[in-house]
């Protein structure tokens, strides 16, 4: 059996998903493709890496196989027996660009196992299994947005997701006359070893200091009670949630000018308050600001490298791409990669 699971891009709502916040992602037309078949032992093959790993029983290797192994462990923890299988994976998703290749791999694995063994679990349960794999087995304390979007993606729609209640709404993504591009800074971030988990701890500390259970209970007034660093982190989360709500409204009204401005202000907040951007992504956003037809841009993903989402009028980005590429190369001696992004449906058999 063969399945595919999409990556995702988050229009806005960065570092809110693990803080019970709002997010506005959509599944993208770049996928992890996965084939599953019975086997005498566990065999995991990656076409992209041209590598095969065999194991008698599931174990953690601190490698790409952990995403698959973690999913199998999560099934077993729930009492499902997963006998040895061969899983072959290929992908046209760029790694580390902020498109969440890891969640796509987890979702593809979870869906394939569920169908192959006849468990036929509902998608939401598979989302929870995939997330558990990343949090408990891989060791990255991610929110639920990435796996959720890979599962529930719908072509020509973004997902307005409340990560506290998991209530969601499909918002039409009518891009006629506009386009979304991803600029990959080609500065790589290893999430588990970066500041990502530290930001999570800081956010937990905010709640502890304020005596609150969730960020949804935190008010602007509460910020005054916090020491400087924690105040900045909390301010970003509160204001980013507001930006998501405004962005949903803008999308519904087809107001891409407003959406673009919200992207720029999101980046400023990620840079100055949450402090997860880096020199390279700041350079890209600053370069794009004020250019004709460029409506908005911001860093996407965990931060410290990765990608920049760019919202523009159709054709406007194409006109300045080379200039941006040259300026970036001159400054950092690194080549940029560009991806035009379109929406896609969620995980499915092929």
Swiss-Prot record:
Keywords, sorted A to Z: ATP-binding, Carbohydrate metabolism, Cytoplasm, Galactose metabolism, Kinase, Magnesium, Metal-binding, Nucleotide-binding, Transferase
Single GO BP term: galactose metabolic process
PROSITE patterns membership: GALACTOKINASE, GHMP_KINASES_ATP
Subcellular location: Cytoplasm
Residues that, per the record, bind substrate: 14-17, 196
Catalyzed reaction equations: alpha-D-galactose + ATP = alpha-D-galactose 1-phosphate + ADP + H(+)
Protein's recorded name: Galactokinase
UniProt organism field: Thermotoga neapolitana
Encoding gene per record: galK
